Amino acid sequence: MGRNKITIEKISNERNRQATFTKRKNGLIKKAMELSILCDCEIAMIVFSSNNKLFQYSSRDMDKLLIRYTDNTDNTRKNLTNQDYNRVFGNKKSKNDDEDGDDDGDEDLGETPTTPHGNLNAHPIGSMENNNNNNNNNNNNNNNNNNNINNNNNNNNNSHHNNNNGNNNNNNNNNNNNNSNNNSNNNNSNNGNSNNNNNGNNANHNMHHHNGNSANISPMQMSQQANNNNSNNNNNNGNNNSNSNSNNNNNSNGYQQQQQAAQQAVQQAQMAQQMHLQQQQQYQQLQHIQQQQQQQHQQQQQNMGPNGYNHQQQQLQHQSPPPPPQQQQQQMQHSQQQQNMNGIIGHHSPVIVGNGVSLLQPSKWSASPYGEDLAPLTPRSASYKGIYGNQYPPQMQPVVNSNNNSNGNSNSMNNGISSPPINQQNQQNQKPPIMNKPGGGGQPMYYDYNGYPQQQQPPQNYNSNGGYWGQNVSSPPPPQQQQSANPYIQQQQQPQHQSPYYHGNYSPQQQSPVLNSQNGHHSSPMHPHQMHHQQHQHQQHPQMQQQQQQQQQHQQHPQMQQIQQQQHPQMQQHQQHQQQHPQMQQQHMNNHQINHHHLNSSPEINSQKNVHSSPLIMNSNNNNNNNNNNHHGNDNNNNNNNNSNNNNNNNNSNNNNNINNNINSNSNNNSNVNNGNNNNSGKVYNNNNNSNNGNNNNNKPEQTIPVKIEKEHSSSPTIPEQPSINVSTSSNSAHVFNNITSNSNNNNNNNNNNNNNNNNTNNNNNNNNNNNNNNNTNNINSNNNSSNTNVNVINNSSSSSTPPISPANINTQSPAISPALVPVVTSLNPQGEETSKPKFKKSLNLSIVIPEVGNSKYPPPQCKLTPINVEATKQPDIPTLPSPRDFYPEINLHHDNVSLTPNYWGGWHQTPRGSLLLTGNGGSNNSNSSNNNNNNNNNNNNTNNNNISGNGSSSSSSSSTQNPNGFLGCLSPRSFNFLNENNNNNNNNSSSGNNNNNNNNNNNNNNNNNNNNNNNNNNNNNNNNNNSNPDESDQSFNRKRKSMEPKN
């Protein structure tokens, strides 16, 4: 027997409705409370009664829950409506009375996130955990483009601060979207590159001032912000570039909360200022007492004879106030800093004390798992005025991603904060160089009203020999520095051997006198007086050095030290360089990319010993982007410069990695890093141009086999007609994936960034894994070479050192082919014709280049792709090669929404629409990159990889693929953006890539041309001397680019 269930329908009697509501309301709220506790979920329940009374329950603050879970930018979370419940529970009458239907709707309704963090990605006011996750997704997702796609969604969901992450993912979006968009925007954000170069500088500062990255991030989260900054750097570029639209849109979500937080910050900053003034008074009193003591010791010294000075120093080791002129300067600085502090109040930035905790910041802001998004103290606001200076405790040290440097992925340098680099020793325990202190490797800083450093002049008592007047500068080197009671000041005294700081981004050549000095400060190229000063500081008498160090301790109140270091460590140095030696600035910007990532490692990190090449080598745009990217361009660097940096980071990281642009440019140089390597020669190599151009140009004409590609796309207005395309695989260029391995090798930073810059660099190709997949595609042809590099469709036939294709080189059974190895049809040219105007027909003719081996020729493979049918005309009396179908899965290319990756990696993965993303595991990426290293040895095969890695825009000219997305083997309609027009010149065809290759002399042109090439096929085609009509190529590109842009 069972009770009869009440029919779920409206109670007709009004009184009964009132009674039922009263009874069940309390039970409903009780169940909601129990559910929130049992399942550790957040519940906000609002019940409206019939008499307009509001009953609500919330496991946390109601308003924040509503904002977090209701204001979603997209439908990543399944929202159940009343219709869903009615659908499940509305048919109870048809069921038996004995059935227990309580759980009937569990499966039908599906699961919704139950944990408090389940929907963080949907949180518009993204918390640091979201940012970290998205950044990790970006870092991890750089290995996985799918994750990048998800990150795009997640970051878009996280918007606000994940706007930056959104731009991280939009960096991945910029890498992917910008490789999709910035494939129009790599190509366009090659505008972004040029803009990123500008945005690199502008967006650098804009991020410091305008980017809402970390506006709600607590100090303990600041070390986590670096990844966000990497993305946020791109966000700045993205904000400055196309991403700024989404970022601005996303940023609009929590604007009111930010305004409220700003007001709170102003109030609290005023309180902090009052506390600071009180402490300042105490400090002045103490300073006065110390000054009196100093005078007493000086009087004693005068009575002690010629040796009294040294004796005085021994007496003053624990009491060493500064000389009066230096004291006046510091007082002037203090007044400047106090003015800056007044200005900070207007910018809602509280003061951070030596322990890294804000004076204004309640403990709940750091204790809350959500980071309390409205916390007034943020790394962005702090970095805006540089409040935090060097005062973070070891776990919070603002460390610029040295790992990111080569890629320009020091994007985290937006806030100058990043997670500690992997390969750095004790960097967490070391303080960044104090540029505004005599012992910090620099001179006292003077700030203007906005907190930026004014041009520095040596102090009046500054001795040209490196010391101050009255100091013995010719005394022997200092002993071990004295340990002070203040551990943070002690860290400042310790030699700092970390490269991750901003000045480490400049080329070691300019710093060589100072780089490995005892002081260890990798400061930016210095004014000659600074260099003398830094070199002689440690040559002064040991006691003098201790005296100066203690003067720093006594003169600077613990808070004063922070305020004196208000400048963002990177902005501070960046503007010092602009002001001190503008004539050297471009040179440094051209060079520091190559070198900065080598600061803590041997110059042969790329196994290319000339990495520290002459300053002229780096392409100015790439370098400027790198400089902008590395300096603040790192801010831009990641994504729009990862869009740019996809070209630029690829160019920048490709400076060492210069994967797409430079390596495509480098494709001549067998060292993939050849921008860096070419740069190594201290020259911009036309070899890149020659090898790129020469790859196609120098290579002998190869046998082209007309292949008919039948492609089903009834509704693809984006594909113009093109009569046929042939695959030219010949190229000398070092495959991009020396860059991958160069990325992995070039920069362990890039390896750190490899997830970002290897992948971001590969993200130029949208080839995080596509780089690996480009590697994979490269590895596919590596089957030709080492069964690792699958270069373009068949083989790089030209001057590559790799063996030509022969039946023995091809494993028809493909067991040795790793999942990452996927045969790829790379560059497509109109049937070997010099060319006709780019036209795409539904039936495309794919011609496969077969290299000549001796006097014998191997016939083309007969291969069919689904839906691309490749029919190779069989030549009589020639043995046939294995069919590429042996290597291909059934690939359905969806040119409208998504393209699917083959099931090598466990199934089909949806990727953003556009060319097929060949994503793989990081392990396969490593192996692929190693394969690419093999391909690096097999430079020529990898040259096609350059094209492969090149997103068409960054495609190395030698690369056979015209696939702008760099996704070889993906002939989706969107992949043909650059299947154009000057396919004749594969060098030129990758147009942007060719420009890169051609413009390897000018990687700016490579990036700009890649960017402009992507932006303007006219430029690329024109620059590439493509025969295609620039107007038509432009139009076709615009049509393609529009089709490639992700739909909101």
Curated annotation (Swiss-Prot):
Q: Which PROSITE patterns match?
A: MADS_BOX_1, MADS_BOX_2
From the record, what ranges are coiled-coil? 249-304
Query: Which parts of the sequence are annotated with region: Disordered?
Result: 74-263, 294-339, 386-812, 916-1048
Give the protein's biological function: Transcription factor that regulates cell differentiation during development. Seems to negatively regulate prestalk gene expression and positively regulate prespore gene expression.
Taxonomy, superkingdom: Eukaryota
Please provide the Gene Ontology terms (biological process) for this protein. Answer: cell differentiation; positive regulation of transcription by RNA polymerase II; regulation of gene expression; regulation of sorocarp spore cell differentiation; regulation of sorocarp stalk cell differentiation
Keyword DNA-binding among record annotations = yes
* Annotated GO CC locations: nucleus
- Low complexity bias: start-end ranges: 130-205, 212-263, 294-303, 327-339, 393-437, 446-466, 481-500, 540-593, 619-699, 738-802, 924-960, 982-1029
Q: Which SUPFAM superfamilies match?
A: SRF-like
Q: Which CDD domains match?
A: MADS_MEF2_like
Major localization listed first in the record, in broad terms: nucleus
Give the lineage: Eukaryota, Amoebozoa, Evosea, Eumycetozoa, Dictyostelia
What keywords sit in the KW lines?
Coiled coil, Differentiation, DNA-binding, Nucleus, Transcription, Transcription regulation
Biased-composition ranges, Polar residues, are: 74-85, 506-522, 600-618, 715-736
Record-level Gene Ontology MF annotations: DNA-binding transcription factor activity, RNA polymerase II-specific; protein dimerization activity; RNA polymerase II cis-regulatory region sequence-specific DNA binding
Quote the disruption phenotype from the UniProt entry.
Leads to slower growth when feeded on bacteria, fewer slugs with lower migration, decreased spore production, reduced cell differentiation, and slightly abnormal prestalk differentiation.
Pfam families linked: SRF-TF
Q: Is Oxidoreductase found in the keyword set?
A: no
Q: Pinpoint the MADS-box domain residues.
A: 1-61
Induction of the gene: Induced during development in prespore cells.
Cite the record's Acidic residues compositional bias ranges: 97-110
Subcellular localization, per the record?
Answer: Nucleus
The name this protein goes by in its record: Transcription factor mef2A
Compositional bias segments (type: Basic residues): 529-539
